[in-house]
Amino acid sequence: MNPIAFNLGPLSIYWYSILIALAFGIGIILASYHAEQRGVNLDKFTNLVLLVIPAAIIGARLYYVIFNWGYYSANPLEIPAVWHGGLAVHGGILGGFLAGFWYIRRHKDLKLWMLADIIAPSLILGQAIGRWGNFFNQEAHGGPVSKEFISKFPDFIQKGMYIDGLYYHPTFLYESLWNLLVFFVLLYILKRKSLPNGIVTMTYLILYSVGRFFIESLRTDSLMFGPFRMAQVVSIAAIIFASAFIYFKLKKSKSIEK
């Protein structure tokens, strides 16, 4: 598996970079469409997106570097080399949210949770696309599997998951397909405009976290916090927080209707 798509002179263009760019591009188009449908000022929304994207990339990279500090402290020139892989989704969510929160606080006509709901389907779709970058880098896979097991997948998956004489769980594919399913669920909920703001976002957190928790248990490259897989710890916390948010938000909405 060659992670390089093509070369421009001395510059190598990686499939990982192409797929991340594609994920952001499609996500921006979709989110802008939903923003326009809901009467959001597109100039302000565009400015928000242009702030959130680099913040998300920086957050995703910093999160990954921090939990792999032993390697990066010895190889500091590798820290900005995101094209080699190493973007942590949870760090990206945190970085993007903090940047968006900062921007929205300075524009009182923008509503945080309404905008988060608009962005959530685009985010999970982008994650579904971006996971294929892991495939080309032959990373974020699970443990070894038998030839019989991997033969159930298409030939190109089998070839991509054949690494150093062994076949591996294509966990990138599991997560990509799960994220795609979550995307359609979020689109359905987003169309129900009677729901309070924030419900789509919290549904995203719950569904993504459920899938990530189970898929993470198969991976061999998990970021660790002591004996715990960090992604699973964050997933549990996200599920608890989002479930409580939805419960109290819907309860408040019903009391207002009465």
Regions found by a protein language model. Name each.
Residues 1-258:
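A feature for loop-to-transmembrane-helix boundaries and adjacent hydrophobic helices
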